[in-house]
């Protein structure tokens, strides 16, 4: 009887020790959420100049989403595009009808469509980017998939930006608008074919990716020069709000160069792991670029519909 009781006590003790060990290991896993570059699987190693702060392969959408609740080297990348993306979605839903229509009731409501078109493009770009940075650590297949989605979002943003501004710039010349819009869509399609190629999404093609998107963005220079020749510089600058378009270009080009050359972590590996590395700077500059274009396309819309700048209104936009 006592022997049987002793065996039961031993069994209970072993079970308790096993449960304690399991709990301890689970606690360690929960505490140890971040990893160094050297601890990552090969497919996750993208930027060897960022040495720590990584979320390791999760194989779980739930764990990827949970990573949004603690600070890691992707947190700023996620939220710098998630928050503005939600803001653009709200603007897409209410800006034209509840803001412009109230402040300037005489404007043609039908002309809102290209303004909405741009806001939808900005939302799509930022939403795709946020999803990529949130879900990229799931697994290699998911990372490749969401990387393509991210790049397609960028192409959508560039396309919507160019077409929306061309619409107001060539408002009274539909044939010009159709020609340059068709050219923009053709270039976008060519870039999309490359983006969907798996080889294009490897680390070796990082500089080429930056150059490609920068070149596609700069293709908008062609209709800008043509418009300046056709309308004269002063009128064309007013039609497309050229000053803000130039600001936008500066932000995008600077962001692409920072991303492509991995500045500043190139000069101090490990010092900018959590805050201040190139991809975070790139994200912030992209957001600033989208704001400049929003300002430009809104001003262009008002100018075309009224022939006036309404600077007192636009200073708040």
UniProtKB/Swiss-Prot annotation:
GO terms classed as biological process: intracellular zinc ion homeostasis
Positions annotated with a glycan in the UniProt record: 73, 197
Stretches of the chain found on the membrane's Lumenal side: 1-80, 137-148, 197-210, 265-283
Membrane-spanning intervals of the chain: 81-101, 114-136, 149-169, 176-196, 211-231, 244-264, 284-304
Membrane-topology descriptor: Multi-pass membrane protein
Protein keywords: Endoplasmic reticulum, Glycoprotein, Membrane, Transmembrane, Transmembrane helix
Disulfide bonds: none
GO (cellular component) term, any one: endoplasmic reticulum membrane
Pfam assignment, any one: HlyIII
Compartment list: Endoplasmic reticulum membrane
Residue intervals on the Cytoplasmic side: 102-113, 170-175, 232-243, 305-317
First-listed, main subcellular location of the protein, grouped into a coarse class: endoplasmic reticulum
GO molecular function: signaling receptor activity
Stated family: Belongs to the ADIPOR family.
Functional note: ADIPOR-like receptor involved in zinc metabolism either by altering membrane sterol content or by directly altering cellular zinc levels.
Protein name as it appears in the record: ADIPOR-like receptor IZH1
Species this chain originates from: Eremothecium gossypii (strain ATCC 10895 / CBS 109.51 / FGSC 9923 / NRRL Y-1056)
Gene name as annotated: IZH1
